């Protein structure tokens, strides 16, 4: 993991003193780091219709954004400095990049959102900004300078005239220069500004952090189909001198009690949160199997050497509660028996199989496991490994 090469800091120290609190530079955290793709291959992805990409052009105190997809010829006209290509969710298109997530496995996998990859020409940068999520910045080819400033929030003044959210008043108080294999952790809300010293690649591991409105929307969506219809508003004691059209304080208190009662439902909270955090970022990549298999057919295929891995767009999470194992996958929830030893082991394998082939040998003779596996395969959540 990222901290394995740093005797000066261990995982408990990082989690207690740095995570979501203050930045940390990890020099040579990934010794011998080799890029997963070339700048040309990244540009090729940016030419694809289904890939989210943009180019940011920068001159002193001025930025311009152009959104993809791009034509190949557009890259031939770019200068050798002062621009940055950013491509979202590259881990979905280049599954090998998911091996980076093994280096941050001390944070639950359902917190990871995606890996964005950027190529910056010399002097290229996207301006001072802040994110609402934590990020690990992994330097690949080249070198990049990062300046860090104060912590920001929703009230921080922004300049949005360029289409970017540029900080209007950025005063750096820390400066780091990252070389290949260096990693910089930046907590959510901390202002930062990157600029390429030498043209190169940066891998940004971002973490999903839904706001309260998203959490409430997810809860409400599930509650619509779950809460009983007779849980309704009722008047408090109506005063004889009540004024027509007035909403009284006692009425608001009655509504508050009703809403608090509706929210005090751990079952709904668990399911809505688990489904929200496993919603796929690119659901269009989750395509059902061309030929659906029966449990018996899957067993035969596995015995003949068929190998499966998680679809690069799949997201998994789980929660053990009482006799039930709540198994979340791509915004869906399955409740499995919690006392089933093999299912529990299969769940562990699925939750930890980031960027690798699943080891399904221990589960081939178990009917419950095969039933789950064939459903995941037919849904397109698991795919056949083509290596």
Specify the residue positions occupied by each region the protein language model found.
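Short acidic (Asp/Glu) and glycine-rich catalytic loops that position anionic groups and cofactors
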Residues: 22-23, 196-199, 229-239, 324-326, ...
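Long, charge-rich, low-complexity alpha-helical segments
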Residues: 1, 21, 336-387
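Short coil/turn segments at secondary-structure boundaries
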Residues: 57-59, 271-274, 361
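Acidic, low-complexity/disordered tracts enriched in E/D and polar residues
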Residues: 265-349, 374, 385-387
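C-terminal amphipathic alpha-helical segment
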Residues: 224-298
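Active-site region of the double-stranded beta-helix
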Residues: 1-17, 30-182, 190-232, 236-237
């Amino acid at each position: 993991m990222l901290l394995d090469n740093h005797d000066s800091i261990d995982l408990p120290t990082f989690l207690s003193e740095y995570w979501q609190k203050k930045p940390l530079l990890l020099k040579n955290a990934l010794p011998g780091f080799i890029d997963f793709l070339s700048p040309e291959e990244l540009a090729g992805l940016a030419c694809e219709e289904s890939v989210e990409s943009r180019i940011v052009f920068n001159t002193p105190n001025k930025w311009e954004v152009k959104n993809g997809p791009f034509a190949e010829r557009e890259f031939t006209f770019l200068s050798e400095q002062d621009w940055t290509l950013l491509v979202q969710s590259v881990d979905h298109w280049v599954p090998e990049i998911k091996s980076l997530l093994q280096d941050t496995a001390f944070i639950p996998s359902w917190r990871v959102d995606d890996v964005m990859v950027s190529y910056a020409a010399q002097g290229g940068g996207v301006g001072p900004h802040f994110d609402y999520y934590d990020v690990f910045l992994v330097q690949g080819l080249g070198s990049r300078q990062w300046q860090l400033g104060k912590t920001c929030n929703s009230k921080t003044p922004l300049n949005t005239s360029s289409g970017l959210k540029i900080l209007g008043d950025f005063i750096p108080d820390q400066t780091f220069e990252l070389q290949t294999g260096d990693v910089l952790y930046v907590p959510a809300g901390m202002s930062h500004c990157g600029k390429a010293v030498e043209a190169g690649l940066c891998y940004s591991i971002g973490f999903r952090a839904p706001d309260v409105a998203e959490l409430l929307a997810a809860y409400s969506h599930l509650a619509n189909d779950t809460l009983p219809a007779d849980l309704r508003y009722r008047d408090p004691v109506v005063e004889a001198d009540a004024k027509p059209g007035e909403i009284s304080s006692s009425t608001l208190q009655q509504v508050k009690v009703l809403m608090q009662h509706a929210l005090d439902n751990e079952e709904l909270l668990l399911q809505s949160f688990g489904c929200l955090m496993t919603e796929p970022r690119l659901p269009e990549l989750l395509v059902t199997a061309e030929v659906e298999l029966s449990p018996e057919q899957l067993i035969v295929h596995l015995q003949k050497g068929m190998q499966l891995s998680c679809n690069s767009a799949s997201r998994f999470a789980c929660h053990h509660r009482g006799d039930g194992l709540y198994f979340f996958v791509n915004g869906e929830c399955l409740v499995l028996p919690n006392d089933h030893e093999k299912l529990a082991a299969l769940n562990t394998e699925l939750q930890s199989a980031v960027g690798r082939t699943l080891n399904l040998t221990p589960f081939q003779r178990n009917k419950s496991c095969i039933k789950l596996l064939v459903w995941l395969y037919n849904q397109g959540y698991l795919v056949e490994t083509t290596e």
